[in-house]
């Protein structure tokens, strides 16, 4: 499914209060995708194949779902949640998803390379077996021909049968199909990366404005705090001057009263 399909109806903004619930669901999906990616990495390190392709397919479907949900989230306008909070939440989820996708793509590419190397080795071994089988069949035909002419020679048993060769070829074909699926999955991840860049670019201007406003608020708060400190300093100095003036006035009055009493 292309991003264009997901974008249909984008001009019609959803008016509901599902933003927090959907954002929480996306966060859980990203967490699950991160766990799958770690599991795939363990499979590769330990050279395990059981359940590997099931986890790969599950991760592929989960990636598509997260992409779809992020588009839905970008379309939601939740007045209760707030535009700034919504924008920051969407931006964080998008970046988290982008990080997980990059790691998933890396392990998928490694998986495809290992699978390709293994298939190439298996095909080379099969080609050798086919060649050996052909030689043995020719030798058997010669022996049968000699036996029919009265020259008896022991017949050698072929080391590998046609059915075994066909079975090995089917296994190789299946693994080649898995490589094609891996390649398709990697291409789908590239499409998702492009979609994420679109979402990030659309949110970028709003996030920049919000960050600018937050920066201004922080600057204004610091300025206000500084002005308050200056005002407190002036007030303290003014109180000190008033106290000094009062002391001087008391001293003067004391001198005058003393003079009057003594006079």
UniProtKB/Swiss-Prot annotation:
Instruction: Fetch the Gene3D superfamilies from UniProt.
Output: 1.20.5.110, 1.20.58.70
Q: Where is the composition biased (Polar residues)?
A: 142-159
Cellular compartment(s)? Endoplasmic reticulum
Q: Where is the t-SNARE coiled-coil homology domain?
A: 169-231
The primary location reported for this protein is: endoplasmic reticulum
Residue list for modification Phosphoserine: 148, 163
The cross-references to Pfam families, in alphabetical order and at most eight, read: SNARE, Syntaxin_2
Alphabetized, the UniProt keywords read: Endoplasmic reticulum, Phosphoprotein, Protein transport, Transport
Q: Which domain of life is it from?
A: Eukaryota
Picking any one GO biological process from the record gives: vesicle fusion
Q: Where is this region: Disordered?
A: 140-159
One Gene Ontology molecular-function label: SNARE binding
**InterPro entries, alphabetized:** SNARE, Syntaxin, Syntaxin_N, T_SNARE_dom
Instruction: Supply the PANTHER family for this chain.
Output: LD27581P, SYNTAXIN
Describe the function of this protein: Has a role in vesicle-mediated transport but not with protein transport from Golgi to vesicle.
Q: What is this protein called?
A: Syntaxin pep12
Q: What is the organism field in this record?
A: Schizosaccharomyces pombe (strain 972 / ATCC 24843) (Fission yeast)
The major lineage groups are: Eukaryota, Fungi, Dikarya, Ascomycota, Taphrinomycotina
């Amino acid at each position: 499914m292309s991003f264009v399909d997901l974008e249909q109806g984008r001009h019609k903004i959803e008016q509901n209060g599902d933003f927090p619930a959907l954002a929480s669901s996306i966060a859980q999906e990203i967490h699950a995708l991160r766990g799958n990616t770690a599991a795939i990495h363990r499979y590769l390190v330990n050279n395990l194949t059981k359940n590997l392709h099931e986890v790969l397919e599950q991760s592929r479907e989960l990636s598509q779902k997260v992409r779809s949900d992020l588009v839905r989230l970008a379309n939601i306008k939740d007045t209760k949640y707030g535009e700034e909070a919504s924008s920051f939440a969407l931006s964080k989820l998008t970046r988290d998803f982008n990080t997980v996708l990059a790691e998933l793509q890396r392990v998928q590419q490694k998986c495809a390379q290992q699978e390709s190397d293994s298939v190439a080795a298996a095909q080379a071994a099969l080609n050798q077996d086919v060649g050996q089988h052909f030689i043995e069949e020719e030798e058997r035909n010669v022996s049968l021909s000699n036996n029919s002419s009265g020259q008896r020679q022991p017949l050698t048993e072929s080391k590998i049968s046609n059915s075994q060769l066909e079975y090995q070829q089917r296994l190789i074909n299946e693994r080649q199909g898995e490589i094609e699926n891996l390649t398709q999955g990697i291409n789908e991840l590239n499409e998702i990366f492009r979609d994420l860049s679109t979402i990030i670019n659309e949110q970028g201007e709003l996030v920049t404005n919000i960050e600018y406003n937050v920066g201004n608020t922080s600057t204004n708060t610091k300025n206000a705090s500084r002005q308050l400190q200056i005002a407190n300093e002036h007030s303290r100095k003014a109180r000190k001057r008033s106290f000094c003036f009062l002391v001087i006035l008391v001293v003067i009055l004391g001198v005058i009263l003393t003079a009057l009493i003594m006079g």
